[in-house]
């Protein structure tokens, strides 16, 4: 319990310090990235260019995630907004994120194939219950088991299968603290649309509120990941004694 309390308190303290220095600029930049992402999805996924637009939107989303990765790296590691070498890091993160997306896509294909026969076939549940179960399991796989892949990309500087392996090892070693500290972010992400599409209509005010709060909890996750991935329980025990 002492270790868990220390992880929470230090992560929150480090997050507050980063927000105190560059909080407004950070939230505005993250909001801009989110807005551009939504705008691109709406524009390129409709009308006559829908088929070609799907491909264009895919690369735009990766580019925007690359921008977000650079912003998050600077805020998590150095408590500052990026202002140099932006082009290099965009290209760097773009490749890592694209490779990771490809691996996740393969995992989703395998999951869809398995869930079709197991959930929709063997379980004999009705269509609604089968769909809810399928979405819930996909949420657990993508957001909890593999949920730290983005932090692995922008903090550990890896991508593709290496990022997925890192996420698996990380959750195995830090399941309880990472799950607990990720709960607010996952709730906000769920409320913003995502996995609830088709099940629940989320009002516009809630979407706006989540767009403001999500960057804060993304930063909290990043700070927690940095602490947990760079230390063991023994090291954190020493840090507690030293700081006290």
What are the language-model segments listed below?
Residues 1-244:
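Hydrophobic alpha-helical membrane segments
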């Amino acid at each position: 319990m002492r270790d868990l309390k220390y992880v929470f308190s230090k992560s929150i303290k480090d997050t507050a310090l980063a927000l105190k220095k560059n909080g407004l600029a950070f939230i505005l930049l993250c909001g801009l990235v989110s807005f551009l992402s939504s705008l691109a999805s709406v524009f390129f996924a409709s009308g006559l260019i829908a088929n070609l637009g799907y491909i264009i939107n895919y690369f735009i989303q990766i580019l925007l995630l690359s921008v977000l990765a650079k912003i998050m790296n600077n805020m998590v590691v150095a408590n500052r907004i990026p202002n140099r070498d932006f082009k290099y890091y965009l290209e760097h993160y773009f490749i890592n994120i694209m490779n990771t997306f490809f691996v996740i896509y393969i995992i989703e294909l395998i999951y869809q194939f398995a869930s079709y026969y197991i959930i929709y076939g063997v379980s004999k549940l009705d269509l609604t219950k089968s769909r809810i179960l399928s979405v819930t399991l996909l949420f657990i796989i993508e957001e909890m088991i593999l949920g730290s892949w983005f932090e692995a990309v922008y903090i550990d500087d890896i991508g593709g299968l290496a990022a997925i392996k890192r996420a698996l090892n990380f959750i195995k070693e830090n399941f309880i603290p990472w799950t607990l500290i990720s709960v607010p972010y996952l709730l906000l992400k769920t409320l913003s649309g995502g996995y609830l599409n088709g099940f629940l209509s989320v009002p516009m005010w809630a979407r706006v509120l989540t767009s403001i709060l999500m960057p804060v909890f993304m930063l909290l996750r990043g700070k927690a990941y940095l602490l947990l991935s760079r230390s063991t329980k023994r090291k954190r025990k020493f840090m507690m004694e030293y700081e006290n």
